[in-house]
Amino acid sequence: MREIVHLQTGQCGNQIGAAFWQTISGEHGLDSNGVYNGTSELQLERMSVYFNEASGNKYVPRAVLVDLEPGTMDAVRAGPFGQLFRPDNFVFGQSGAGNNWAKGHYTEGAELVDQVLDVVRREAEGCDCLQGFQITHSLGGGTGAGMGTLLISKIREEFPDRMMATFSVVPSPKVSDTVVEPYNATLSVHQLVENSDETFCIDNEALYDICMRTLKLSNPSYGDLNYLVSAVMSGVTTCLRFPGQLNSDLRKLAVNMVPFPRLHFFMVGFAPLTSRGAHSFRAVSVPELTQQMFDPKNMMAASDFRNGRYLTCSAIFRGRVAMKEVEDQMRNVQSKNSSYFVEWIPNNIQTALCAIPPRGLTMSSTFIGNSTSIQELFKRVGEQFTAMFRRKAFLHWYTGEGMDEMEFTEAESNMNDLVSEYQQYQDAGIDEEEEEYEEELPEGEE
């Protein structure tokens, strides 16, 4: 089977990761101790992608939990699914990274990284045919961002031909935890551009908006936000976990989604969005799902795709869905919104189907889009970065850990390059059209 090894680093990564394991354990019919008591053969068929079968009919996640302080780990261990994980796979330091990327990447994190790699190696050796790695982390802090990117580059060195997918929580404009988020995020993106194959961008503000607007929660907790993220993660990985008519794995997804190697930052969405308690009391149809899925309000990253164009996108439908209906809907979306799709990649919507819906729903869909409007997100972080870096504010925290200002300058220019690459492809048309257009302009201008 094509296994995936999952890593979660830092507080945010561990909380999202815990929600993800809770969600998929439920989908595969596992209780909180990893014992199978499901009803469908399909739940077992590809269980081994994420779970290792231990003795006594118990399934153990292929998960490695990493943090530089013990706090979050204790919370995961004490949480509802704490007994699911293999105790040896908790790797933690004592000192914490204090929201400092340099500590996570160069000092504290670097001391712990070999211990983590040992566990990763052990998990990888337990696989028949390892497909790749997925990592959940945030880009704004110290451990998830600094140590997370360190792990990614180390794993890249050791497993150069395996896929690397990241679920990265990007700092959002309104919801900020720390002042130095722009530094940490820019330094992280600098790493992700080079070392990740696909990065799913999630941001807290967009999640808050979805909770308030669509789910009608007046005061959303992190639990509610994590629930949304885990729904998307479950959707993105459905095709890997269940048999379906049209299955894709991480590599197929990348082949279809990444036209240029650096442009692998995706926006994600999910439908139907229903609040946690009220599992929808109405029937859901494919057109409805499609409409909600392409709605800018449902994107989990704070950038509006109407300000850019889609290079590629992928839709994953779950439940009893007719292939033809899905394809018609997709064609429909593309022809209605053709201005939001680049015309130089024909058929740039890819669809996948899976027969098993998430718990409590009859059907659902997950959306993954590679849109040039994601540059808004990087632009925003870049502007905040420049504002602070120009004054060299807070730099001593980083240089004190042995970093060089040069590295900041490089990260900044790499991020600016990324933004202009997205812009370049947003403006690019098909050459012939552009030439005709230029000839027509003079007489038809006024």
From Swiss-Prot:
Domain of life of the source: Eukaryota
InterPro entries found in the cross-reference section: Beta-tubulin_BS, Beta_tubulin, Tub_FtsZ_C, Tubulin, Tubulin/FtsZ-like_C, Tubulin/FtsZ_2-layer-sand-dom, Tubulin/FtsZ_GTPase_sf, Tubulin_C
Compartments reported by the entry: Cytoplasm, Cytoskeleton
Cellular component terms (Gene Ontology): cytoplasm; microtubule
An example Gene Ontology molecular-function term: metal ion binding
Predominant subcellular localization, coarse grouping: cytoplasm
Cofactor: Mg(2+)
Entry binding sites for GTP: Q11, E69, S138, G142, T143, G144, N204, N226
Region (Disordered): 422-446
Biased composition regions of type Acidic residues, renumbered to the chain: 429-446
Record's keyword terms, sorted: Cytoplasm, Cytoskeleton, GTP-binding, Magnesium, Metal-binding, Microtubule, Nucleotide-binding
GO biological process assignments: microtubule-based process
SUPFAM superfamilies (alphabetical): Tubulin C-terminal domain-like, Tubulin nucleotide-binding domain-like
Residues binding Mg(2+), per UniProt: E69
Family: Belongs to the tubulin family.
Assembly notes: Dimer of alpha and beta chains. A typical microtubule is a hollow water-filled tube with an outer diameter of 25 nm and an inner diameter of 15 nM. Alpha-beta heterodimers associate head-to-tail to form protofilaments running lengthwise along the microtubule wall with the beta-tubulin subunit facing the microtubule plus end conferring a structural polarity. Microtubules usually have 13 protofilaments but different protofilament numbers can be found in some organisms and specialized cells.
Annotated function: Tubulin is the major constituent of microtubules, a cylinder consisting of laterally associated linear protofilaments composed of alpha- and beta-tubulin heterodimers. Microtubules grow by the addition of GTP-tubulin dimers to the microtubule end, where a stabilizing cap forms. Below the cap, tubulin dimers are in GDP-bound state, owing to GTPase activity of alpha-tubulin.
Protein name per UniProt: Tubulin beta chain
Organism: Gibberella zeae (strain ATCC MYA-4620 / CBS 123657 / FGSC 9075 / NRRL 31084 / PH-1) (Wheat head blight fungus)
Record lineage: Eukaryota, Fungi, Dikarya, Ascomycota, Pezizomycotina
Gene coding for it: TUB2
